[in-house]
Design a protein with these regions (language model features):
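Post-cleavage N-terminal segment of exported redox proteins
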Residues: 2, 7, 15-51, 85, ...
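Short cysteine/histidine-rich zinc-coordinating motifs and their immediately flanking basic loops
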Residues: 78-86, 179-185
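Solvent-exposed, glycine/polar-rich loop segments of beta-barrel outer-membrane systems
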Residues: 184-191, 250
Length: 251
C-alpha cells in the first residue's frame, strides 16, 4: 500500500456521510472532460449508438410462442425509465426496469428471459431509457415501498469490505476530490445503462455497483440480487428531479 493511498484511506475513513443538498447535486456529466462530454452528446456516432440500434431492432422483433413484439403492445415508453425501480404489488417486491422487461417477455411473449447484463438486455434497456432522456427522475415512495428505500439508504451508508468504506463516504462527503487522478462523482444514476470507456462496452448500474464493492474488497452480490435493487431504488430517489441521460457515457 502506497503512502498516498494510506493517507487517502485515513481521510475517507474519518469522513462522515452528510447527504448532498438538493441544490448542490451534480450529474456525473459535469465531472467529465470536454471530449467525453462530446461522445455523450453525439447520439449518431457516439459509442452507445450501436446498442440503441440493436435495442430498436429487439423492440420490433417478434419473439416467443406468442409471436409478439414489444411494439405490438406498447406504442412508446416515454417517461417509463424515469420511474424505475418501482414496487410491484402482485409480487410484493421492487423491480428494476430490466426485471420488468423480462417479466413481460416471459408472460406476454412466452419467450425465455434475457440474461442479466447481456448485450440484448442492455440494448433493449438503453432503447427504452432513451425515450425518457431529458425527463426528470420521478420515483414514487409509498407506504409499501418505503421499507425498500430505507434498506437502500442503509446499504449506501454501511461500511463494508476490507477497506471498511461506505458509498456515502466517497460520494456524499468527498465528491469533487481526486482519486487516482479522477474526480469523485456524486454517484447519481442518471444515465444507465451507459457506455463506460473503461469497459469499452455498455453496462448496467448493477455492474458499476459490483465494481465499487470489489474496489473496497467486499464480496459482490449476484446480478439481480434484492440488495442491488434496494440500492438502485435509493440512488434513483436520491437523484429525484434530475434529468435522465440514458444512454450516458462515462470515463
Amino acid at each position: 500500500m502506497t503512502v498516498r493511498f494510506f493517507l487517502l484511506l485515513l481521510v475517507f475513513s474519518a469522513a462522515a456521510g452528510a447527504e448532498i443538498p438538493l441544490a448542490e447535486r451534480r450529474s456525473g456529466y459535469e465531472f467529465m472532460g470536454r471530449e467525453t462530454r462530446a461522445m455523450q452528446d453525439d447520439e449518431v456516432t457516439g459509442p452507445a449508438a450501436l446498442w440503441l440500434l440493436d435495442g430498436e431492432a429487439l423492440w420490433k422483433r417478434k419473439a416467443g410462442s406468442a409471436d409478439k413484439s414489444c411494439a405490438d403492445c406498447h406504442q412508446g415508453m416515454k417517461g417509463v425509465a424515469a420511474r424505475y425501480p418501482a414496487f410491484d404489488s402482485a409480487r410484493n417486491k421492487m423491480l428494476n426496469l430490466d426485471q420488468r422487461m423480462n417479466i413481460c417477455r416471459v408472460e406476454q411473449q412466452k419467450a425465455p428471459a434475457l440474461q442479466l447484463e447481456s448485450r440484448e438486455l442492455l440494448s433493449l434497456s438503453a432503447y427504452v431509457g432513451r425515450q425518457s432522456r431529458g425527463m426528470p427522475i420521478e420515483i414514487a415512495v409509498t407506504e409499501r415501498s418505503r421499507p425498500f428505500l430505507d434498506a437502500g439508504r442503509a446499504a449506501f451508508n454501511r461500511r463494508q469490505g476490507q477497506l471498511n468504506l461506505s458509498c456515502a463516504q466517497c460520494h456524499d462527503s468527498n465528491w469533487g476530490k481526486s482519486l487516482a487522478g479522477t474526480p469523485i462523482p456524486q454517484a447519481h444514476p442518471t444515465g444507465y445503462p451507459l457506455y463506460r470507456l473503461e469497459w469499452q462496452s455498455m453496462g448496467s448500474l448493477q455492474r458499476r455497483l459490483r465494481n465499487c464493492m470489489i474496489g473496497v474488497r467486499a464480496e459482490p452480490y449476484a446480478y439481480g440480487a434484492p440488495e442491488y435493487i434496494e440500492l438502485e431504488f435509493f440512488l434513483m430517489w436520491r437523484a429525484r428531479g434530475m434529468k435522465l441521460e440514458t444512454p450516458a457515457v462515462r470515463p
